[in-house]
Amino acid sequence: MDWSCSHPETAAPDPNLLPDITVGVAIEPRPYQLRIISKTVRMFTGEYVNRHGEQEPPANSVMIESPTGSGKTVMGLSVARRMQRQFGYSVGWVAMRRNLLTQAEEENRRRGFDVDMKLISMFDKTPPQVDLLVVDEAQHDGAMSMANLHCMIRPQKVLGLSATPYRTDRIKLCFDKVITDAGIHQLIQDGYLSRYRHFTIPEYTPEAVARFYTAEPQRWGKTLIFFHRLEECHACQRLLNDAGRHAEVVTAKSNRDQQLDDFVAGRVNVLINMAILTEGFDCPSLKTVFCRPSGKSCTIQMGGRVFRKHPELPLKQIVQCKKTPHPFIKTAMADEQYVWVDGAWRTLKLNQAINAITQNARRVIAQSQVALPKVVAANRAHPMPWERDR
């Protein structure tokens, strides 16, 4: 298992913490959010103290890497608010998709951040000049369109927000610093993301997926389905529609805004796509994601859509094929696991025992005080996971 080890909530206080940074805003910052916001501001201002006790020079660009549902928009607005109030920075918020800009604008108003900011499309021909450019879904920063935008705006500071910056080499070229903190598994355990069930099916074809969905539509609820090819998407759509389940295929050319509105309103039961909904799609009432067989990066992008919490859905669901290269349980442990065997779902009871042991261990660890021997601490070659910054 590769459950990411991340900053535990029981760790010692961070010397870079700015506890008053969200005062006056209608949010109660989560501990990891406060750490990330504080570290970002201090990196921009040249006040960041690294693990060696050295104060680092100001960074021109910082990227926040944090899972879907962890509140990246809130963190970005918090940083922008501080930089604008303290230094008078003009702020621009840029994204590839209009819905991301709309979400940022609504959060800014609703939460009382009151950041005076320009909303910028990544494809703007004449973008406004700003001092701080916030780049939503910053994994696109390696793309030529974003590089051109940088050249036109020439901001003093750039803040990137991303759940999964896979183009690691390109990202490192675009950002001076990359901040990581809590991963999906940790955020689920701490109650910030939804817990989930994991289902394994024998094969992943349009026919198989449609068959499983139509057999138990109430089990799956609002569902997002991913396929590799467009013809697979349309094949699955036809099968679902023939069975009386309203499904839509979302593409770059379809009326995506209307499709998403219909899905949220319950007029559409299922959305099918190749990859376009791996980003910028936020729907807490989404219950199930069918993830096509893929590697780790793409699997996390697809599955990550389902972890936003909803009061009526205590357990979300991820469905994968047994041949997938990266089962999601390698990223985050599921509360329950089911496998389709001999025409029925078989539960893996061991999961509940593992979860009980894990929770007990977490309680014991949280109540323990551990200190490294002075000699070991003085000569430690590698930082702890929560001390890392790149």
Regions found by a protein language model. Give the residues of each.
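Walker A/P-loop
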Residues: 51-79
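Conserved Walker A/P-loop ATP-binding site and its immediately adjacent core
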Residues: 68, 73-108, 229-231
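Conserved helicase motor
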Residues: 95-100, 118-126, 140-143, 228-231, ...
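Conserved interdomain linker/interface between the two RecA-like ATPase lobes of SF2 helicase motors
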Residues: 178-235
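A conserved SF2-helicase RecA2
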Residues: 184-194, 308-389
